[in-house]
Amino acid sequence: QLSPSEAEAVLAHELGHFKHKHILKSIVISILGSLLAFYILGLLYHWQPFYQGHGVNHISSYMGLALFSMVSGVYTFWTTPIFTWLSRKNEFEADRFAAKYSSADQLIGSLIKLYKENASTLTPDPVFSAYYHSHPPASIRIKTLEKLGDT
């Protein structure tokens, strides 16, 4: 359970996302990514080497969509760190906003409580985290917030 001042710090963090238009930027990136994926799918779903290169002999719209869905992750795997970096950048920006307009110390307290409540590790593997975690590790966020701290 967060104290009222910790809840205020979390709310200030979320308002930081709003202030910096993180949600709008994420939606635009998602839409552009989807349009690019549909464009590539449109190029590939009648292209015989796409099917043969993945061991499929039957060409159809359904098979093209299924095959594209199955293999696209292999080709986009290397872009994952770019998107996690952008997401983490947004989190640090929202943390700075919360530290400025609320309390860095209270946000630190709320982060610790939320990580414990969610059974998350405060020190995840850095390589795995760089690829798959949209939020920076709590330990790094806490160190950054301590530099911005109230005390």
What is each of the regions a protein language model found here?
Residues 1-59, 78-151:
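Polar-ligand-bearing catalytic/cofactor-coordination segments
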Residues 57-70:
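Hydrophobic alpha-helical transmembrane segments
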Residues 69-81:
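Hydrophobic alpha-helical transmembrane segments of polytopic membrane proteins
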